[in-house]
UniProtKB/Swiss-Prot annotation:
Its main location: secreted. Residues 347-374 form a coiled coil. The keyword Glycoprotein does not apply. Residues 388-415 are annotated as: Disordered. The keyword Coiled coil applies. Belongs to the BopA/IcsB family. The gene is bopA. It holds the Pfam family SicP-binding. GO terms for cellular component: extracellular space. It comes from Burkholderia thailandensis (strain ATCC 700388 / DSM 13276 / CCUG 48851 / CIP 106301 / E264). Plays a role in mediating bacterial evasion from the host autophagic pathway. This is Effector protein BopA. Keywords: Coiled coil, Secreted, Virulence. InterPro entries: Globular_prot_asu/bsu (IPR011070), SptP_N (IPR015203), SptP_N_sf (IPR044899). It comes from the Bacteria.
Length: 512
């Protein structure tokens, strides 16, 4: 099976991509473009010559190659992004029958498939936040935005969290009512949102089309009347599908965020739990989501279509920002009204920043593991670690498992503080001999980051996120070249251990 990456790699050359028969099966390549092909391509656009047999045969051969290539590419998209994402890419990205698959079309179709599949590395995680949006196309088609907080980390399904924030008016609005404040209505889940985003007329046409195709399949095409043949041509478009209750709905664009703290892949319940340092604060978001719902019950909050604070997009953004989205990307409010398109763009920016930082964090982790491959570095670091267990975060797990007593929590914070001081002192000692011509800009940046980003018990989630970001990005700039000495390697390991202390403080901050 040819991968999406293989198509993208060939398309980067800017020419038409084709699928041919290789020694080991179908293979993707760039179409041959010699003098003959260039001549026929030119003649196929000349009115007086394009109907010549030779030119027509060439044009038909190209269209056949393009159709086959598109079919294989859609199969590759389906394997990577699922049938729904591949169908969306075909519906919105393929356009003309027999059109060439070039760099622009490959990029466009991959982008569409990603949007329908969902964007974000947190999609398989047990603890995640999902931001959903349906495109706004003006007041007649305003779209929608909603947010769901999910926690399926516990083995007991009865303790799973599913908090859905979906802000609607209690009746259909139109005209001047778009500026009025009306009573709000909260939807219970994503499935109800999907049903609400498909019109009654479209739903009726989809049902008629499905029924007509079933009848034609059972009775035969020659027995179908004109109305049935007409209805049978009405197929669902990308995103339109039946749910398990046989109700039609329209799928949303989805953006996935990880929750800060211990997390794991929900597809592998026996897999290891890892601490996610960069993400959203689940507890803070749950508090705000419940405050919003309580405000709807008491009448404190209303729904207003044209609003910066009380429409669907602004409410979804409010809960997203309550989780710390602005720790990653500053938020700028709309001048007149928030809308699902702006909300989606902001959610994408936050997701991209969070995923990039978590990827850098993983890169630093792997680099430090390689540094410990040196016997001398490993021995020196083991001696330091055994003296104070500085290289890990053993108490962070305890903090993440529930609320501890005030005395236990304070003892834990005091131990974290002692480790921070010990790591800082070790880093300063390792840096003492690096002065003058032996100290370059990278050394100075790392020393400055260690000084400014040492965590403390006074730090909240925002401060800890900022400090972790600076340390991770500073260390990330050191990964391209091997350290020149054991001392440099140990300095990097000390900085990595400081990130471990930030994790420990973060676990306490989100559990408090």
């Amino acid at each position: 099976m040819i991968s999406v990456g293989a198509f993208a790699a060939c398309a980067r050359q800017g020419e038409r991509v084709v699928v041919g028969d290789g020694a080991r099966g179908p293979a993707v390549s760039v179409a041959r473009l010699g003098m003959k092909e260039r001549l026929f391509a030119f003649l196929s656009h000349v009115p007086l010559l394009k109907h010549c047999d030779a030119v027509r045969r060439y044009a038909e051969q190209v269209r056949t190659e393009n159709r086959r290539t598109l079919e294989v590419f859609v199969l590759a998209l389906s394997k990577r992004y699922g049938p729904e994402g591949a169908k969306a890419a075909f519906d919105y990205g393929a356009r003309r029958d027999g059109a060439p698959l070039d760099q622009r079309r490959v990029r466009n179709m991959v982008s569409i498939a990603e949007h329908f599949h969902g964007t974000g590395d947190a999609k398989p995680m047990a603890r995640q936040i999902v931001f959903r949006s349906w495109e706004c196309q003006g007041l007649d088609h305003p779209g929608h935005a909603s947010l769901t907080i999910k926690n399926q980390a516990d083995a007991d399904a009865g303790r799973h969290v599913y908090e859905h924030v979906s802000w609607w008016p209690d009746r259909k609005l139109g005209g001047k009512e778009n500026v009025n404040r009306v009573e709000p209505k909260m939807q219970d889940g994503y499935r109800i949102d999907k049903r609400s985003e498909i019109s009654t007329t479209t739903e009726q046409r989809l049902r008629e089309g499905d029924a007509a195709r079933r009848k034609i399949l059972a009775d035969g095409f020659k027995y179908a009347n004109e109305d049935e043949r007409h209805d049978a041509r009405f197929f669902p478009r990308a995103g339109q599908k039946l749910d398990k209750d046989a109700q039609w709905g329209l799928s949303a664009r989805k953006v996935y965020f990880p929750a800060i703290g211990f997390n794991h892949d929900k597809r592998d319940t026996d897999g290891p739990r890892a601490f996610v340092l960069f993400g959203l604060n689940e507890a803070a978001m749950l508090r705000d989501a419940r405050t919003v719902k309580e405000g709807a019950k008491t009448g404190e909050l209303k729904f207003q279509m044209i609003s910066k604070k009380e429409n669907c997009a602004s409410m979804a953004l409010r809960v997203l920002r309550a989780g710390g989205a602005e720790h990653f990307v500053p938020f700028t409010a709309a001048w007149i009204s928030e809308d699902p398109n702006r909300a989606h763009a902001y959610a994408l920016a936050v997701q991209a920043r969070i995923d990039a930082l978590n990827q850098q964090r993983a890169d630093v982790e792997r680099h430090c593991a390689r540094l410990r491959g040196s016997a001398s570095v490993r021995q020196a670091w083991r001696a330091f670690s055994e003296a104070g267990n500085a290289s890990g975060s053993p108490l962070a797990d305890q903090a993440g498992r529930g609320r501890a007593s005030a005395h236990t929590r304070q003892a834990r914070l005091d131990e974290h503080a002692r480790e921070v001081e010990r790591i800082g002192a070790s880093f300063a000692e390792l840096s003492a001999g690096r002065s003058g011509k032996h100290r370059d800009r990278a050394d100075a940046d790392l020393a400055d980051a260690m000084k400014r980003c040492a965590p403390s018990a006074r730090d909240d989630v925002a401060a800890l996120t900022r400090k972790a970001s600076v340390l991770v990005e500073t260390l990330g700039r050191h990964l391209d070249a091997p350290p020149p000495s054991d001392s440099s390697a140990l300095r990097m390991l000390a900085a990595h251990a400081m990130i471990g202390r930030i994790e420990a403080f973060m676990a306490d901050a989100i559990a408090a």
